C-alpha cells in the first residue's frame, strides 16, 4: 500500500489488515510508526472493545500465520499502551477471551504471545490527589516561602505539576477536543486547576506584602524561580509563573515597579519574549524542539494545536464516515505522541513531602479575578483623574489570553485530606518543643506559609494561648466550607430593627427587641448581636449584582481559564496601564485574610 492510497484515506478494516500484515513470521514490524499511530488514535474512530472484537473475529476465521500475526499485534498493543487494558475492564476481558479461545483450540504458541496478566495497575492515573510518604524532620526554613531558595521552590513546583501531567491519557485529550471542556474529565480538569492555582498563588504572595519594597522582593524571587524553571526545561510551570507576574493585578502596581531592578526587568522581558504568542508561539516551539533529556511542554499551547486541527480537518474523508482521513490522524498523532513521550521522562528533582502538602493546600485556595484585583487596589489605590464623572474602561490583563472554558470547584473531600496532611506537616516541623501545640511564637513561622491566615486568637478557640491540631484543622476546614475557598470581605454592619425573630450567626441565639438590638451586614445580609460582632468568624460574601451588557443576569459558568501570554512589546517589567475610575462601594472593604 503506497503513500497515495494513504492520502486518499482508508477504512478501519483496511487499517486493521495493514497493521496485521506489518508483522512478519518472526514478529518484526515493517512499519512500527503506522501501527503505533493507529493503536493510539483508534478510540477517535472506534471503541477499543470493538477493535478487540474485530481482531477476535479475524483470528477465528484466519489461518495459523494470520493468527500469529494477530497475536503479535495484540502483544504490541499491550506493551505500548498497558494502561488502556488496566483501566478498561471490558477490553481486558475481551483479550482474555481471545487468549482462552486460542488455548481451547490448541494454539498455545500463539496464546503465549498474549500476556495481559502482567499489566500493572494504573489506577493512580485516575486519582487527583497528591500522595507521598512522610519524610523525616527537615530544616524549618525549607517550608518558609519568604526564605525558600528559588531553585528549590522551582523544583517542587515542577514535581507537583509534572505528577499531575503524567496522569493524562489519550482519552483525556480526545474528550477535551470533542467537547471543548473538561466535563467528565477530572484529570485534565485538575491539571488546569493546578496551572491556574500557581498563577493565582503568585499574585497573592506578592499582594500579601504591605510595602512596595517587600512586593518587589517577592517579584524578584519569582523571576528567579522562572529562571530555574527554564533551566529545568519546565515550560508549563514557567508559563504559569510568567502569567501570574504579568497579570493586571500585579502590573498596575506602579510604586512596586519603581523598586524592581533593571536586571530583573531584563530577565523577565526575555522570558516574556520566549513565551509570546507571536507567529503561533514560534519562539517557544523553536526552544522546545531543541530540548534534550527531561522537558515539560507548555500543555496549553499543544492543546490549542489539537483544537485547531480538530476544527480545521474532518475525521472522515467521505460523507458516509467510513474512510478515515489519514492526514488528520497523522497530524493529531504527532501532537499527542510528543506529549506522551514527555510523560515518560522523570524530572531531575527531589521533593519534600511536607512542602508538597503545603503547596497543594495553598494552590487549592481559589479566589476570583475580582477579589485579587480588589486586593491589588487595596495595596495601591487608583490615582484619581480630573474627570471625576467619566469612567475609564477596565484594564484587561495585558499578557493573558482566555482561551478555554472549562471549570470546577475544588473537591471538598480531597481538600480535607490535604488539610489534614498539611496540619501534620506543620506540627512536625514547627512544633519545636514537641508538646503537640503551636505557640504564638511558632505561629509567626507558620503564618509565613499562609499570608491570609487569620489572627492567632481566632484559631485558638478555647483561648488557652496555644493552638492544637484539632483547632488548626477545624479552622482550615471551616474556612474551606464556609468561604468556599475564597477570600471574603469585611462586613459592613448597620444597626437594624428586627420585626421578627432572627438568629445570631455567631452564638445561634435569637436577637430580641425592636430598638436596634442587632446588626445586619449591608453586603451579605448576615446578622449578629453587637457583642458578637468582633467574634464572628464568617467573612462577608457579597451578593452578586453583575449584569451583562444586555441587562441580563450573568451566572458564572463552569469553566477554567487556562491562560497563555499574548504577543506584545515591553520596555519595562510592566506596561503603563490606564486605571479605572474608582467605583463608590458602600458594601464593604476587601479583607485580605483567609
Swiss-Prot record:
InterPro entries the UniProt entry points to: C1-like_sf, EF-hand-dom_pair, EF_Hand_1_Ca_BS, EF_hand_dom, PE/DAG-bd, Ras-like_GEF, Ras-like_Gua-exchang_fac_N, Ras_GEF_dom_sf
Membrane topology: Peripheral membrane protein
Residue ranges with Acidic residues bias: 582-594
SMART domains per the UniProt record, alphabetical: C1 (SM00109), EFh (SM00054), RasGEF (SM00147), RasGEFN (SM00229)
Chief site of localization: cytoplasm
Entry binding sites for Ca(2+) 2: 460, 462, 464, 466, 471
GO molecular function, one term: calcium ion binding
Subcellular location: Cytoplasm, Cytosol; Cell membrane; Synapse, Synaptosome
PROSITE patterns found in the cross-reference section: EF_HAND_1 (PS00018), EF_HAND_2 (PS50222), RASGEF_CAT (PS50009), RASGEF_NTER (PS50212), ZF_DAG_PE_1 (PS00479), ZF_DAG_PE_2 (PS50081)
Record-linked CDD domains: C1_RASGRP2, EFh, RasGEF, REM
A biological-process GO annotation: Ras protein signal transduction
SUPFAM superfamilies tied to this protein: Cysteine-rich domain, EF-hand, Ras GEF
Region spans: Disordered: 377-402, 573-594
Function summary: Functions as a calcium- and DAG-regulated nucleotide exchange factor specifically activating Rap through the exchange of bound GDP for GTP. May function in cell aggregation and adhesion.
Entry similarity comment: Belongs to the RASGRP family.
Protein name per its UniProtKB record: RAS guanyl-releasing protein 2-A
Organism of provenance: Xenopus laevis
Amino acid at each position: 500500500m503506497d503513500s497515495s492510497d494513504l492520502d486518499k484515506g482508508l477504512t478501519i478494516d483496511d487499517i486493521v489488515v495493514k497493521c496485521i500484515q506489518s508483522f512478519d513470521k518472526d514478529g518484526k514490524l515493517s512499519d512500527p510508526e503506522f501501527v503505533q499511530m493507529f493503536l493510539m488514535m483508534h478510540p477517535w474512530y472506534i471503541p477499543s472493545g470493538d477493535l478487540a472484537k474485530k481482531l477476535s473475529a479475524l483470528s477465528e476465521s484466519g489461518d495459523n500465520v494470520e493468527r500469529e500475526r494477530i497475536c503479535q499485534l495484540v502483544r504490541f498493543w499491550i506493551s505500548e499502551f498497558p494502561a488502556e487494558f488496566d483501566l478498561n475492564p471490558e477490553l481486558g476481558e475481551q483479550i482474555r477471551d481471545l487468549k482462552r479461545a486460542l488455548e481451547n483450540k490448541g494454539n498455545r504458541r500463539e496464546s503465549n504471545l498474549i500476556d495481559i496478566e502482567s499489566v500493572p495497575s494504573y489506577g493512580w492515573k485516575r486519582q487527583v490527589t497528591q500522595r507521598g510518604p512522610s519524610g523525616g524532620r527537615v530544616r524549618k526554613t525549607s517550608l518558609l516561602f519568604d526564605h525558600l531558595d528559588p531553585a528549590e521552590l522551582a523544583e517542587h513546583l515542577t514535581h507537583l505539576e509534572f505528577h499531575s501531567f503524567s496522569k493524562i491519557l489519550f482519552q483525556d485529550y480526545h474528550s477535551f477536543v470533542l467537547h471543548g471542556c473538561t466535563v467528565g474529565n477530572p484529570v485534565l480538569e485538575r491539571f488546569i486547576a493546578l496551572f491556574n492555582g500557581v498563577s493565582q498563588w503568585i499574585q497573592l504572595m506578592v499582594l500579601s506584602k504591605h510595602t512596595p519594597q517587600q512586593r518587589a522582593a517577592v517579584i524578584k524571587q519569582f523571576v528567579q524561580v522562572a529562571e530555574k524553571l527554564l533551566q529545568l526545561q519546565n515550560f508549563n510551570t514557567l508559563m504559569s509563573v510568567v502569567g501570574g507576574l504579568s497579570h493586571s493585578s500585579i502590573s498596575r502596581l506602579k510604586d512596586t515597579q519603581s523598586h524592581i531592578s533593571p536586571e530583573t526587568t531584563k530577565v523577565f522581558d526575555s522570558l516574556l519574549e520566549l513565551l509570546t504568542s507571536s507567529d503561533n508561539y514560534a519562539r517557544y516551539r523553536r526552544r522546545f524542539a531543541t530540548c534534550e533529556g527531561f522537558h515539560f511542554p507548555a500543555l496549553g499551547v499543544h492543546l490549542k494545536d489539537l483544537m485547531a486541527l480538530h476544527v480545521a480537518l474532518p475525521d472522515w474523508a467521505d460523507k458516509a464516515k467510513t474512510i478515515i482521513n489519514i492526514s488528520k490522524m497523522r497530524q493529531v498523532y504527532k501532537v499527542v505522541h510528543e506529549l506522551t513521550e514527555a510523560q515518560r521522562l522523570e524530572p531531575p528533582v527531589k521533593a519534600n513531602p511536607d512542602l508538597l502538602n503545603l503547596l497543594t493546600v495553598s494552590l487549592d485556595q481559589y479566589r476570583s479575578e475580582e477579589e485579587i484585583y480588589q486586593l491589588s487596589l487595596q495595596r495601591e489605590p487608583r490615582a484619581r483623574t480630573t474627570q471625576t464623572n467619566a469612567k475609564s474602561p477596565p484594564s484587561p490583563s495585558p499578557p493573558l489570553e482566555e482561551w478555554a472554558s472549562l471549570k470546577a470547584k475544588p473537591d471538598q473531600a480531597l481538600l480535607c485530606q490535604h488539610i489534614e496532611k498539611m496540619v501534620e506537616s506543620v506540627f512536625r516541623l514547627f512544633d519545636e518543643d514537641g508538646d503537640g501545640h503551636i505557640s504564638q511564637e511558632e505561629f509567626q513561622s507558620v503564618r509565613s506559609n499562609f499570608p491570609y491566615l487569620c489572627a492567632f486568637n481566632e484559631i485558638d478557640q478555647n483561648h488557652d494561648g496555644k493552638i492544637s491540631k484539632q483547632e488548626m484543622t477545624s479552622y482550615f476546614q471551616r474556612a474551606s466550607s464556609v468561604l468556599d475557598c475564597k477570600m471574603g470581605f469585611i462586613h459592613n454592619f448597620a444597626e437594624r430593627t428586627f420585626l421578627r425573630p432572627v438568629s445570631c450567626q455567631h452564638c445561634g441565639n435569637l436577637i430580641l427587641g425592636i430598638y436596634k438590638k442587632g446588626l445586619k451586614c449591608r453586603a451579605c445580609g448576615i446578622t449578629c448581636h453587637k457583642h458578637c460582632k468582633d467574634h464572628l468568624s464568617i467573612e462577608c460574601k457579597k451578593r452578586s449584582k453583575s449584569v451583562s451588557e444586555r441587562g441580563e443576569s450573568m451566572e458564572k459558568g463552569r469553566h477554567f481559564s487556562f491562560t497563555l501570554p499574548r504577543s506584545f512589546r515591553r520596555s519595562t517589567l510592566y506596561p503603563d496601564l490606564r486605571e479605572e475610575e474608582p467605583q463608590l462601594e458602600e458594601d464593604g472593604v476587601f479583607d485580605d485574610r483567609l
